[in-house]
Structure formats: C-alpha cells, structure tokens
Amino acid sequence: MNNPSTTKAPLADYLAHLPLAEEERERLGESASFSELHARLAGAEGAAADAGGDPALASVRARLQLGTPELDDAEMFGVDAQGRTFLKISPPIRRTKVIPEPWRTNILVRGWRRLTGRSNPPKPKRALPRARWQRVGSLRRFILLLLMLAQTSVATYYMKGILPYQGWAFVDLEELAQQSLLDTVQQVLPYVIQFGILALFAILFCWVSAGFWTALMGFWELLTGRDRYRISGSSAGSEPIAADARTAIVMPICNEDVPRVFAGLRATVESMAATGEMERFDFFVLSDTNDPDIAVAEQQAWLELCRETKGFGKIFYRRRRRRVKRKSGNIDDFCRRWGGDYRYMVVMDADSVMSGDCLAKLVRLMEANPEAGIIQTAPKASGMDTLYARMQQFATRVYGPLFTAGLHFWQLGESHYWGHNAIIRMQPFIDHCALAPLPGKGSFAGAILSHDFVEAALMRRAGWGVWIAYDLDGSYEELPPNLLDELKRDRRWCHGNLMNFRLFLVKGMHPVHRAVFLTGVMSYLSAPLWFFFLVLSTALLAVHQLMEPQYFLEPRQLFPIWPQWHPEKAIALFSTTLTLLFLPKLLSVMLIWAKGAKGFGGVIRVTLSMLLEMFFSVLLAPVRMLFHTRFVLAAFLGWSVQWNSPQRDDDATPWSEAIRRHGMQTLLGIAWTLLVAWLNPRFLWWLSPIVGSLILSIPVSVISSRVKLGLRARDEKLFLIPEEYDTPRELRATDEYTYENRWHALKDGFLKAAVDPLLNALACAMGTARHNRAQAIETVRGERIGKAIDKGPEQLDGATRLALLSDPVALSRLHTRVWEEDRDDWLGRWRKAEADDPHAASVPLAQVVPGDAGLLPAAQS
C-alpha cells in the first residue's frame, strides 16, 4: 500500500476530476490509497471485480453514474460473466449466416465443369416477375444502343475524312515485304497512327454519346414530369409503417472527422424523431477506426449523442477489432450479428445526412414494392466552403439531376447502387450479396474494393429490383474540399472499378449490370485513351512535318496521293463534340430558368455560374486525365501509389503539396507546348486548352482550394444552390452541431482514456475483449501494461494502444498504476493536455444531476 503522505496530492487531483459534491469529495479524500478510494466509490457492487485485483475496474459503474446519471435510468449497465461492468452499447447478438458464393470468373473453367458433370452455381430460385417496365426498359436500352452506334458511326466517318492520309487502300503488303524496313516504316507509319487515332476517337465519341443521350432523356423526364415508372410514385407517403417493418440505419466509419460525423447523425436522429416513427428505426455507428485517439473520441461522442437525443437503446456503437474486407466487411459483420432483427437497412456514409421524412418514405416505398431489393436516393451535395467544392456542389446540383433521371429512364428497376443513402431489403442482401474475394493473385485479386456496383448486380441476379428514387428529397452528402482530395478518392474508385470488370462474364449477371461494370471501367479508362489519342495526334503532326510524304504507293501509279486537309469538316466535327459535351449543362440551366432560378441566385447568377464552372471544368479536365492515366497504369502494373496528404484544418492545398503533385504535369505541358510550337505553331490553337491547363495546374489547384474565395463567391451568389438559399432544417442542425462539437472536441483520446477518471470508466465499460481468466491472457496483459508504463504515452505504438483500449482489465490496471505510482510521463502529459485545451472543463467538477446538459457540466474556462 502506498504511503499516505505521498498519496494525498495525486489523490486530491484525481477527486478534482470527478463530479462530486463537496462533502463526498472530502469523505473520499480520507482514503489511504487509490485502492481504498475505488473501493469506497464502488461500494458493494464492485467487490467481485476488486477481488480480482482490479480496483479501478470495480469503480467503473460508480464513476459513470457520477458523470452520466442517465445511464441508470436507461438501464444501460450490464455485468459480464466475470462480474465486470459493461455498457449495453449494442443489442444482443442473434447470429445469421452470411456466406459469400465463390466467384467463377473464367468461362473456360465453367464450360469444363459443365462438360465434366460438375455443377456450376444454380440459378436463383426466385425470378423477378415479368412486368411491363422490364419490356419497356429493354426497348429503351436497345434504342439507346442504336442512337449511340449511329451517332458514333457518322462522327467516325467524318473523322476519317478529316485525317490527311487517305491512301491506305493503295498500300501493297506484298511490295512492303520486298522493300527495306526504313522505306516500309516511312510508307506505313502515318496510316498506322491514323488507324489508332480513328479507333480511339470512335471509342471516346461513343462514351460521350452515351452521356449525351442519358442527359437528354433526363431533361425530358424532368421537364414533362410524366414518368409513369417512378418508384417514388408508388407510395402515398403518409401511410403508417407496420410495426414489424423494423429498419436499421447503419453508418460505417473509419478514422473520420468525429465532430462532423456525430453532428450529421444527431441531425438525422432528431429529424427521424420528429416524424413520430422513431420506434421503427435503430441507428448503428459501425466503426473500423484503428487510430486510438479517434476511437476514444468516437466513444465519448456516442455517449454525448445518446444523452442529448435520449437515444440510449436506439443508437448503438460497435468498433471492430478485426478489420477485414473494409467497408463491405463492416456491413457483413453487422448483418451477421444483428441483420436478422431487421427487415430493412439504410446505409449512410460518414458525411451523409438524411431527413426523417426521406427515411420514412424509403421504408414506405419498400413496403409498397415487395419486388424491390434496393432503392437508391440521389444525394444532394452541400456543406462545403472552398471554391473548388462549391463549384462541384453547383455542378452536381444543377447537372446531376439530368443524368440521374436519365439513368433511371434507361435502367428502371435494373439500376445503380452507390453504397450510401439507400435502403436495402435485408434478407436477400444477406442471402445473396455477401462478397467473396476475387480469385488469383495480383492487384486485381483479393477483397473487392468498390462493393456497391457488385452488390446491386447480385441483388438483381437474385431476382430483386434495384431502383433510383431520383426525385426524393431529404438526402444529402458532402464532396471533397479540393482537387487533390478528390483525386485521392478517385484512386481507390479507379482500382475498384477495374477489379469489378473481372465479374463482367460471371454467370447470371443481368446485361444492364454488365454494362454498369463496363461504364465503371470507362469512367477511368477513358482518361488514358484520351491521353493516347492526343499523343498519337501529336505523333501524326510530327510525321507530317518531319517525314517526306509518299505520294506514289504502288508501281505504275499515274496520279499522286496528296495529303488532305478539310478545315470545314474539322470545325463541324469539333463543334458537334462540344455540343455533346456542353449541351447537357445548358439544358440543365434552361430547366432551372423554366422552374425558377431564385434558389440558384437568379437567372443571371446561375447562367454566369454555369459559364465559370464550364471554364474551370475545361481547366481541370486535362489534369484529371493525367492523374487517372497514372492510376490506371498503376493498377495494371501493380504499382503501389502512395498518397499521404497532410491534415489541413481549412482544407486548403499548400503550395508545396501542389508542386509535388502537379510539378511533372507542368513540365509535361511546357515540353509539349515547345514541341508542337517547333513542329507547327498553328496546331497550338487546337492543343492550347490541354497544354495550358497542365501549365496552370499548380496555381489552379491551390487557388481553387481556398475557403475565402468560396465564401466570397457565395456572397456574390455565384455557385449558389437551393440548400444554401433556403437551408433545410437537417443541414442547419448539422452545421450547428458540428460547430458545437468542434468547440469541445476530444484531443489526445487514448492518453485521457488511460488517465482521466471519467473517460477511463467509459473506455473500460465499452471495451469488448472480455476474456475469461487465464494465465496466458494475464501474461500478455502484464507485458502490455509494462510496455505502456516504460515507454510512456508518446512512445507507445498504435497496436498496443488499441489492444489496451479494447481490454477493460488491462486499461483499468494501467489507470491504477499511472495514479498509484504518480507517473509523471503520463500525468504530466495529461495535465498539459488539459491546460492547453481552452475548452476543457474547470476543476474541481461540480456534481452532475439528471437533466444537466453536459458530461462535464462545470463552467468553461
């Protein structure tokens, strides 16, 4: 036992950080040791835990009751098999089998298995009942294919007439074999380059054509409002939700911005409660966080959220200790533990906000459409202040509805799922949508990265519809704040979409979802195709300027084959391509003119914003092209692309990072400009949008990431969106709660979980590694605690921190040793962290009584 004279000082400090009445603080201050203090705090309830040599663990419940008395009223305390207190942060587990079907991606293997009598996976027992919308959808997609092919054929024919070398038919292969290699190269090279240009042009034009017709039909849908196949029209929107139609709203997170995540979740919870349908919904925060400081911040944020919304027993938290299969594995784990308790599941992202009306409407739509497996909303982007993000918000808000409505027009009930802000029918998802790793080795094998498209394809293969409710309000998300953060996300999406293409020929996939896999690939593969198209165009210019033209391509040819140039055809084709690219944007703005532009700043402001956004999109397109080309090559070649961006409070891109990321692009733009100027300066007029963008990439990336410019644009009503003009209640609440959460955001989470009396009690009660007593476990615990004591909080590695955080016994023993031994490396660092935090509670803490607003209700310093 410690000497009382050496214990009093830290003992008084410890008690000062507990919200006690003054008389109780004096009584506990008479304790001769920390063990006695915890025994007095625990009373008879903690005897079992204390008998095991864990005095701090014995007082966990008492300390939590002091800080959060609402826990008792909500019956949140439980006792495990060893008599240790825990919080009921998740419902009782009722396990459901989640078994992924192995992928058979090789059609030759499938054919061999059929020949040898071994069965391939059977077709699903359930078939989607044949409905009129399926016939209509098939007819529409056939028409779309004809339109794309016809448009591409005409454009390719024009392109062929524009290219200078028209004598390929006169090339005699037999003669080529008899002449020198140099003569053959000089004669054939221009035609080979032209063929490559023509092939790439046809592919790229077809891709642009698909987007054009999608936007055009979306414009028609939104203009007329006569979509008889709208999924949102199948429910009146006010019918009561059945008592057994329970819905889990799940939010998978991983090392996220905790104040923003829980602010958005609180706004969603409160909006849901306002509908009067809260009894049908439960909320789950599914954490894959592996940063100990963030994990502790999540625990405290969960407790505060439950207390502020009276959500104990309705809002749950689970942090995985074994992170497998990333987000899809996180969802699988939820389905395996609790999926059988719910009929539906709504998946939200960390930056998602959804209104209660939207959530209730989704459930009603599912109830009204028993053949629907997934209903995807069209989230509206909002909430960002940088110039880049505001331009992207404006673009997605103005142009996005056309493309989303167009997707619905062509796909109907065989549509997309984007992985968040969507409702899923739980049982078929569990039965059919678990994802096995892709077989083989290399960068395109292993756990599937972009799970959403694959899950939609599996849901449709199982006989369930996948719909987009493109006109459903109340669904929101946030966009990356700057170009480099967007590209960081694109790198992951690029690899995931390329992996998904391995499933293109998997048995049973619907043709629409095979097309979805193809379009997912083209979203990124179009970048290297465009880059190679530009490279070949430059190469053709070099051949035309540097090589002596071959006018006579066969013996006894009477008339020369002159290189041709038709500027009128080139201008016509160029104008047509620009029309396909930019007409959808103009149609979007025309639709706003027709329906009212007040929410976008008025007719003049929305038009000016469109023109500015078009200018910036032209500037940024070549930059994205080079990055996406790099991502595609890295995926195919198995390169590991490291991208560790620094943390930035204002989301601005530093000049140093912009130079590092865009420097090679700038040099390429300068070199390309000099080369073309040397070959033929007149060609620079055609290439200037490309090389000019690359040369300016550094300042454009930096300047567009500035918050001040974004706020100034908002003040001028540029890039204004309706969610800013008349902000929905949920978004206003999210901003308010984010500000409040940042004001008292928890820093140095693990340090405080190990030292602070209240946070240690919370972390111990939420620890999930609840082992039985065993000598091997005790040995490992002792090693971890000894390592933590020896190294101190700053030198302790992350893996040991996580292990201690998950083990309530080890964490409580570390807490006890730090205070009993008066460890200055821990206590001194903790006191400094408290002193450096201007929003930390003053000590001594006043006693908390039910109804108080905060966890630490003392006056703020």
Curated annotation (Swiss-Prot):
Keywords: Cell inner membrane, Cell membrane, Glycosyltransferase, Membrane, Transferase, Transmembrane, Transmembrane helix. It comes from the Bacteria. Pathway: Glycan metabolism; osmoregulated periplasmic glucan (OPG) biosynthesis. GO terms for cellular component: plasma membrane. GO terms for biological process: glucan biosynthetic process. GO terms for molecular function: hexosyltransferase activity. The keyword Magnesium does not apply. The keyword Methyltransferase does not apply. It is an enzyme of class 2 (transferase). The chain crosses the membrane at residues 142-159, 198-220, 521-543, 572-594, 601-623, 683-705. It is a multi-pass membrane protein. It is found in: Cell inner membrane. Belongs to the glycosyltransferase 2 family. OpgH subfamily. Involved in the biosynthesis of osmoregulated periplasmic glucans (OPGs). This is Glucans biosynthesis glucosyltransferase H. It comes from Pseudomonas aeruginosa (strain ATCC 15692 / DSM 22644 / CIP 104116 / JCM 14847 / LMG 12228 / 1C / PRS 101 / PAO1). The gene is opgH.
